[in-house]
Amino acid sequence: YQSGNAIGIHSYSHDYKKIYTSPQAYTGELLQTEQLIYDIIHVRPVISRAPGGTSGHFTPAFWKAINDIGYIEVGWNALTGDADGTGKTASKEVENLRRQLVIRPYLNTHLVILMHDAAGHEATVQALPDIIKLLKDQGYTFRVVTTAIPPSW
């Protein structure tokens, strides 16, 4: 964040059965995580990304609840396959993304890619330089996520 990156919240527990029981459960986790982040770096994030995405989890009440506490939800509209097992190698992840860019040309106006860098996702880290090159070669630019970002869907 000190170099200009955004800080967002994903959840505290990542427990779907817990966080999606109600809008209050979800926002409670956001606020719990927000406080933890604030205690460490003195920044209060207002951006979240729902574990597993909002589709199938969020109802209008969830959208209202996050809006009521001043958050925006930033979802993804493309993925490398590192979460579903289709991107087992760096080259496969790059190819998964390349294929999506071809079949979804509307992504050229607003692309948010689901990628993970935690343990077990070493292929994603290895794929990142090639993904950046692929996107730059196709004219994409990179920006920091802010509250002004339009929805990715």
Where are each of the predicted segments found?
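Catalytic domains of cell-wall/extracellular-matrix polysaccharide-remodeling enzymes
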Residues: Q2, G8, S13-L114, A118-K136, ...
